[in-house]
Amino acid sequence: MRVRKPAVAGYFYPAEKEKLIQQIDWSIKHELGPKALQMPKLGEKALGGVVPHAGYIYSGPVAAWLYSALAGYGKPDAIIIIGPNHYGIGAPVAVMKSGVWETPLGRVEVDGDLAELIMRHYKGVEDDFYAFSKEHSVEVQIPFIQYYFGDVRIVPIVVWRQTLSTSRELGKAVATAIREYGRYVYVLASSDFNHYEPHEVTVQKDDMAISKILKVDEAGLFEVASKFDISICGLGPIGALIVIAKELGFGNVTLLKHATSGDTSGYKDETVGYASILFHR
């Protein structure tokens, strides 16, 4: 059995179980956090959403918003996590179709059936364990998933070919796979927003991108990111999520929380933007 060991425990989040639980508790209770483990539902059903993936001390309070919102809809049968491939290693679009992911909170199993369905409907995705070896965009979501939902299965996907066409192809394949799977699935697009600019600039640029996401406009998102040089690391995963939402009829999008690393750290000269955005109907 393939075991994906933690790559960023002790860096992005605590490597010890109790300290990790305390860090997630801190994220929820933080002045920028949701203050509750479970939020009232916005509509009848949720698809998932956009969630940041920085170190917990920076983006944890914002990330907690999406998880607390999803907790209001209940535990899913599986969670698909689509993140960027920051290191550019492995396949252009990679999935891990078997094995487990390990964190200080224990192990979660990959849902092989759902992963196989995605691969069946998109020939551009490859089963590539190596592509995940260093990648934090998926890893940092898993302790939150374990904290909120326990032993739910996951399907990890990372993308370094972040084009509009790739997002559309992947999104349509995932939507088809979810339909055929026939059970309750959440989809997470793991992404931070604008990088390493002053707080005011990051807020302004993020707002332009978020406005396109709220309009369920993947083409507009890619266009504004290119035109205004908005350095969104998970542009492709967000684009895929928008396509999945369109295909499955989740037309309502709600911005739960937007902040920057300057809000959590106090250092506002060079910041990274974070947003939790819920897709629902």
Swiss-Prot record:
Tell me which HAMAP family the record gives.
Answer: MEMO1 (MF_00055)
Q: Which domain of life is it from?
A: Archaea
A Pfam entry, by short name: Memo
UniProt cross-references to InterPro entries, sorted A to Z = MEMO1_fam
What does the sequence similarity comment in the record state about its family? Belongs to the MEMO1 family.
Q: Which CDD domains match?
A: MEMO_like
List the protein's name.
MEMO1 family protein Pars_0062
SUPFAM superfamilies in the cross-refs: LigB-like
